[in-house]
Amino acid sequence: MKVLWVALVVALLAGCQADMEGELGSEEPLPPEQPRGQDSQPWEQVLGRLWDYLRWVQTLSDQVQEELLNTQVIQELTVLMEETMKEVKAYREELEGQLAPMAQETQARVSKELQAAQARLGSDMEDLRNRLAQYRSEVQAMLGQSTEELRARMASHLRKLRKRLLRDADDLKKRLAVYQAGASEGAERSVSAIRERLRPLVEQSQSRAATLSTQVGQPLLDRAEAWRQKLHGRLEEVGVRAQDRLDKMRQQLEEVRSKVEEQGSQIRLQAEAFQARLRSWFEPLVEDMQRQWAGLVEKVQLALHLSPTSPPSENH
């Protein structure tokens, strides 16, 4: 009985994996098996033979369900989700700190949009975890239901969730680019505005210096020239300081963008490793089930020669 449940769970997971691999563009083939049909996969052969025998099965052991359908998958997904949201929150706080010199209105808008993007990403990841938990519950109660319908529905949910997660990541990258451009443009406008405000003062000081030179003489002219040069130097100092701050802000934004891309790469690598771990869990079960199934077929065939009652024939 345990072998039959193992076969059923493996068949469902293999089917969902096949649909997801088709969406992600994976080209890794499943292990070879003697075909039941010309184009059928090994899990399809196992599932087809298994349904003939499951018509005789009326009850299942609760202990078998607890052993096979544990919460390890959902727990690992929860840890990955919490780590991801922690990194997103740290990135948002760092970016808000860098945008502190900007106008209050701009800073509030950026903070609000980043919080919304973080909330969407968290909602999508929570939805993914809930879908897997729902799928686990449906597998526990799936005896007598349509496996193909359950597998297709789960694969469709995962494809939609993957598209939503990718869309959120693209939206976050686009917003980063917009914020970087806006910060650069705002800093340049600030420098230009400071120069425009100080230009009349410089011109006025030059005019006064010329007037004083004609009225008072060379000493006052020298003093006015020194004042003009001091004011000009301060203006240049303000411009250089603003430019340095702009360059520093650009560098920090670039570091943040690199950090986000690195985190995205780590998430993808963890997802691939998680998928490989799932495959390594269930492939030995499939092989063991196939060996036990062969022995079961021999026993059934032997029983057919000894008993007038025979099981239903295969219609695949």
Curated annotation (Swiss-Prot):
Region (LDL and other lipoprotein receptors binding): 157-167
GO molecular function list: cholesterol transfer activity; heparan sulfate proteoglycan binding; heparin binding; identical protein binding; low-density lipoprotein particle receptor binding; phosphatidylcholine-sterol O-acyltransferase activator activity; phospholipid binding
Family matches, as SUPFAM superfamilies: Apolipoprotein A-I
Coiled-coil blocks: none
InterPro entries named in the record: ApoA_E, Apolipoprotein_A1/A4/E
Phosphoserine: residues carrying this PTM: 146
Superkingdom of the organism of origin: Eukaryota
Residues binding heparin, per UniProt: 161-164, 228-235
Residue ranges of Sequence repeats: 79-100, 101-122, 123-144, 145-166, 167-188, 189-210, 211-232, 233-254
Residues with Methionine sulfoxide modification: 142
Any one Pfam family match given in the protein's UniProt record, by short name: Apolipoprotein
UniProt-annotated stretches for the region Specificity for association with VLDL: 277-289
Recorded family membership: Belongs to the apolipoprotein A1/A4/E family.
Protein name from the UniProt record: Apolipoprotein E
Gene behind this protein: APOE
